[in-house]
Amino acid sequence: MLTKEDVNNAYYSEDSHSFGSKQSLIKHFGKAEKQLIEKALADNDIYTRYHLYRKPKYYSPYYVYRARQLIQADVINFDNKDLVDFNDGYKYLFTAIDVFTKYAWVFPIKKHNCKTSQQCIARIVQESNPLKIENFQSDRGSEFKCRDVINYLSKENINQYYALSDRKAAVVERFNLTIQMLLYKMMDKSMTRRWIDFIEPAMKIYLHRTHRTIKMSPLEAESSHNHQTLREIFMQKYTKANLRKKKPKFKVSDTVR
């Protein structure tokens, strides 16, 4: 018989459902245990402390059809004296994500500049081989809008462009929230300020966890055998998005003021 202790042990393990949502634990234990899981999580200090309510908001999707068609990148700032002193001088996390497969990369860095960004991008290009990155998107931060990065991407024949709307690079921004929440939960559970020790287990959880958008884990999505299934999932999203678009109020040749 399932107990609250079993639920908490599963929540704190390093499996795909660890430090996750209520739904991930229900999927793990079964719908019959939903009530007990809800009660256990309601008494779980880490879960309740970091639980977020998000008001649904509709955005037009990114139109992608293959792996490495679009990579989004960003930098997470951990430049807080209380944290820097405990993390060997590391102040930032360089993050990047494949918008199609949701596969992600994170690299701890000490300096927030053009050279470190170029080095991180080069690692992603190398690890992606033989897949060819086609497009690279980021915000207009100085660490991306600089000579080293621009020249490197040009040399690799990768199209670079910047996010100009208030959404910024929305997919990597959402990934940033996911990885930060995992790191802070693990730090809180272990009562430590060394986030650098939890990068590997946090990424293991993320890469093995079923992603809500693609209905599979990023590791499963990386397999070429699943790319056609991914395309079908995205095409359903695109069809719904097109139906939601407002029809124009005017037609060609209409007289307007």
Where are these regions (language model features)?
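Short small-residue beta-strand/loop micro-motif enriched in glycine and branched aliphatics
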Residues: K102-F107, Y161-A163
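Residues that form or flank phosphate/diphosphate-binding pockets in enzymes
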Residues: T116, F144-R147, A170
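Short beta->alpha junction loops
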Residues: P108-K115, S165
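Domain-scale segment recognizer with a strong primary affinity
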Residues: K4-Y12, K27, Q35-E38, H51, ...
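RNase H-like DDE catalytic core and adjacent DNA/metal-binding regions
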Residues: M1-T101, P108-K110, R123-Q137, S142, ...
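Short amphipathic alpha-helical segments
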Residues: E33, N113-T116, F198
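A short, polar/charged loop-to-alpha-helix boundary motif
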Residues: C114-I124
